[in-house]
Amino acid sequence: MTTMNERDLYYGQRLAEMIRCKTVSHKEGFEPEEFLKLRRVIGTLFPLVTEKAERTILGKDAYLYKLPGKDPSRNVLLMSHHDVVEAAGSWQEAPFAGVIRGGKLWGRGTVDTKTPLFAEFSALEELLLEGFEFPVNVYLFSSHNEEYSGDGALLAHDYFIEHSIRFDWISDEGGAVIAPPMPGIDKKCAMIAVHEKGRCTAQLIAGPQQGHAGLAGAHKTPVMRMAAFMTEVDEKKPFIRRLHPEVRGMFEALAPYMTFPMRTVFSNLGLFSGLLIRLMPKLNAAAGEMLGTGCTFKNISTDDDGTCRAQAFLRCINDADFAKDLDTLRKMAECHGVRIVLRDEDNEYYKPTSLDSRGYQYVKETAQAVFPYAAVAPFILPAGTDARRFTDLSDAVIRFAPIDIDDQQYASVHGENENISIDKLPIAVDFYKQLLRNYA
């Protein structure tokens, strides 16, 4: 491993062994063979971690490793799940063959998220080989059913609560080093998620109306009233929109790298916030989602008596705003004879990480050092991660995978032809090594 090319291939061949494990997770049942195969591969690839770490298996295949530190009262947590989604469609290379071609390793899980997991294990293994003493306890957690929000992370959370374990910081998947998220930036961006949108599933019910057919609105069927309600919500977009601290932080971090006139706008948020709130939803759906609650309607059906049922899947950023958004939604629904039913267990909200927290600042500084060619910025993640289960265990829950990917690789997550450039593997390992080596 004397040249970068040799190191690229070395890591690529080792990661390929993990990709060849078909660890597809299903709600319907657990098929252990490929998961046990991956466990054996990890044991072979990382013998020092296997020897020196305390390993606990949670549930059917979530695993938790602990390497003790010089200060036994402090802890940090690395995370990446090892389950993957099915690999349907037409692929250039078989999705579980682990083929290296054209400088890329092809296969399901190369981006989401066996590469980050491999980089975490590799960093631990290499630091142990160097004789490095970790300053604090280092935990590595990997769940087996993240892809369908299974119980792996919940079991880990219960374990940490039971053993009174809190963390200085937690690092999971989320952002990455990607192409600029908006026009006018001429360099790659290391996007670090410090918050992810909460999720709420509300039941919508439009029952048959009683009364004379000549009364106002009585001629509308439950389906018609449900459709009218959905249409009004979609057209009026009634939810609160604001520049949340995480979004302001993103704009402030990216503004120096923008071209004129975008730099002027994003460097003066006090003057232009109103304009941005109006324009962002027009840029793209993801930009609009960063401003507040998002709503998707689904699963519309009818009962034998004509009652129409549906669901509203709501994704919120701020819990106080969301409470007001729900009131607005209920009032709109009442006007159409639609009732909203919401149970406490159907509503999840996750505490954001402050941009001033020591943990975020440390991860940001590490990313700036390891990826000097990239602009480093926070953002709000619209998708879900295992990390959301742990926001009560740390003041700094960071969602960032140190993988440098292009647009095709980014789009391949849960799609066809997922792949990773093997020349980007060393820097991912180096990120975790620096994150652990310099922390005190």
Describe each model-derived feature in a short phrase:
Residues 73, 93, 135, 166, ...:
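Short, solvent-exposed loop/turn segments at the edges of secondary structure
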Residues 82-83, 233-238, 330-338:
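A common structural junction motif
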Residues 154-155, 159, 213-238:
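A short core secondary-structure module
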Residues 186-188, 207-213:
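Flexible glycine/proline-enriched surface loops and loop-helix/loop-strand junctions
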